[in-house]
Amino acid sequence: MAVKIIVGLGNPGPKYQWTRHNAGFMVLDRLSHLAGIAISKKTFSGVCGEGNWQGERLILLKPQTFMNLSGRSAAEAIRFHKLPIEDLIVIHDDLDIPFGRVKLKQGGGHAGHNGLRSLAQELGSGDFVRVRVGIGRPVHGDVVNYVLNNFSPEEMASLPRLLDGVVDLVEMLAREGLPKTMSLYNNKDLI
């Protein structure tokens, strides 16, 4: 049975719960609910849950270090479990993808995303799988305020469909691997 560490990026605390920057946390919470894997154990500078789902062993991790230091948490988990970086799946928000769309990528730069920057620094490589959840760019105004603000009411209405779609993608990714999942889901509108 393969083991995958799935890290959702976000900021801890109720203040950030519904912000665009917490898309990774939201997906992980939905996956946790559907898979019956409680994310409650305080470890690896985060909260973690482990269990079997759809024939795969999953370790679900939500760093509690705030976005800019997320890499420390993921690196602790990878080292403890002695897993290669190829078994790491990171779910994060992406400004360059319209809301409701998702893209997959193996490796690459951080594109200004501080959580990805921290991961690459702490792991010594950016060669992990990324599930990029589109949040779109602000039409006007500051990007920082945009990502740290809650989704709009219209977006909130579509969020359950988006989260369920990303969970389906993650399930396929853990079971079938990146190439097959990319061919089905890359740049797909999930809402």
Curated annotation (Swiss-Prot):
Catalytically driven reaction(s): an N-acyl-L-alpha-aminoacyl-tRNA + H2O = an N-acyl-L-amino acid + a tRNA + H(+)
Location of this chain's protein in the cell: Cytoplasm
EC number(s) given by UniProt: 3.1.1.29
Matching InterPro entries: Pept_tRNA_hydro, Pept_tRNA_hydro_CS, Pept_tRNA_hydro_sf
Site (Discriminates between blocked and unblocked aminoacyl-tRNA): N11
UniProt keyword annotations, A-Z: Cytoplasm, Hydrolase, RNA-binding, tRNA-binding
GO cellular component terms, semicolon-separated: cytoplasm
Site (described: Stabilizes the basic form of H active site to accept a proton): D93
UniProt xrefs under NCBIfam families: pth
Name used for this protein in its record: Peptidyl-tRNA hydrolase
Species: Geotalea daltonii (strain DSM 22248 / JCM 15807 / FRC-32) (Geobacter daltonii)
Lineage: Bacteria, Pseudomonadati, Thermodesulfobacteriota, Desulfuromonadia, Geobacterales
